[in-house]
Amino acid sequence: MPSDDRFADAVKPALEALLSDLQHTTEVLRRAHISDRRSQSRDDFEQSYDLQGNLNTQSVSNGNITTSPYKRRSSEGKDYSKSQERIYENESRLNPPVYSRPSVQSLLSQVEEPPIRASSSRKSLGPPSQAQSYSDVRSNGRSPSRDPLHSDSMIGTMNGELSSKHGVNTIPKGDCAACGKPIIGQVVIALGKMWHPEHYTCCECGAELGQRPFFERNGRAFCEEDYHNQFSPKCQGCHRAITDRCVSVMNKNFHIECFTCAECNQPFGEDGFHEKNGQTYCKRDFFRLFAPKCNGCSQPITSNFITALGTHWHPDCFVCQHCGVSFNGASFFEHNGAPLCERHYHESRGSICSQCRGAINGRCVAAMGRKFHPEHFRCSYCNHQLTKGTFKEVDRRPFCHKCYNNTYALTPA
């Protein structure tokens, strides 16, 4: 896969440098190890030869017929040569010379091969006598060192060098839950599984989630945007997902900034909001649109009001429509749908005494285009009440017949 190629290209220079160091170190150790093996085998043979010589000398002194020590020494020398050849063959088989630099794939493949046991090779070293002497050497505490080119030792050294010097971890941490391949390097642990960073993605949009916050739902991983779009409540104002604080009213959810007046789109202040037909309004717009209007000023009524003449009034607006005097709980008079005080009511109807300017509530005298209380309709000269209904008018003033005749009848025209 592309990700595997990128990883191989990234670690290739580090592996090349490390393998070069390993090649040099291995060759030096191999030569030292072979030399040590030969010296140990020679010492073992000399001990065995000395033992045989002593036995031969003892047998001759006892008068026994034995093989000549010169012949035995010659045969032992031949056995020694054969033993050395076997040792060298085994050493060559265990420690082959490094003719070329091993590849990364060959080193990693050796991890799966079982390590070669040193005991199996030691059993094939020469005759029984030499094998026995070699075992004796081991029992004396001189055990040979482990083969430096042993596969598990070499791979372990390589892993340690890569981890300490280059920060590259070559030990698989587990299998990726997405692709099923081993994970070497960075790993994402989520939903109880392990993933390659590039394989742990949103199940909706496919975006990588290794370095981003994510949400889990029914065992599936979602990026923040897709999770909120699918499962978060929606704002009734903008119809987008709500991811933070919200306002819940009338079984609806709103962003705080979207919870505004349906008329002026301004946020609600300390006065709160009012609801009408599923819409929210600020106090000013709600009363302006839906509150009853005062018949006096045509403004919305928001508090106390007076109902009169089939309509509503602010208490301050329910006054005489001519003089503006408040009725103060007293009676009022209506004329053409307007509340009036008594005086202006009678003025509007023409029922004001022309003499006293008082209201005429009962009988009245209509004369000269005016109205009078009966007791106020008098002669302008003698001030007698004109009760008979006959009078004389001079300059819009009433006179009785007597005063008229005395004053105006004798006056020449």
Curated annotation (Swiss-Prot):
InterPro entries cross-referenced by the UniProt entry: Znf_LIM
A cellular component term, taken from the record's GO annotations: plasma membrane
Knockout or disruption consequences: RNAi-mediated knockdown leads to developmental arrest at larval stage L1.
Pfam family, one: LIM
Keywords tagged on the record: Cell junction, Cell membrane, Cell projection, Cytoplasm, LIM domain, Membrane, Metal-binding, Repeat, Zinc
Gene Ontology molecular function, alphabetical: metal ion binding; vinculin binding
Transmembrane regions listed in the UniProt entry: none
Basic and acidic residues: bias regions: 33-45, 73-92
Region (Disordered): 33-157
Polar residues bias: start-end ranges: 49-69, 118-143
Ranges where the LIM zinc-binding domain occurs: 174-232, 233-292, 293-350, 351-410
Tissue/organ expression: Isoform a: Expressed in all 95 body wall muscle cells as well as in the pharyngeal muscle cells (at protein level). Isoform c: Expressed in the body wall muscle cells and in the pharyngeal muscle cells.
A GO BP annotation: nematode pharyngeal pumping
SMART domains xrefs: LIM (SM00132)
Domain note: LIM zinc-binding domains 1-4 are sufficient for the localization to dense bodies, adhesion plaques and M lines in body wall muscles.
The family this protein is said to belong to: Belongs to the paxillin family.
Descriptive protein name: Paxillin homolog 1
Natural source organism: Caenorhabditis elegans
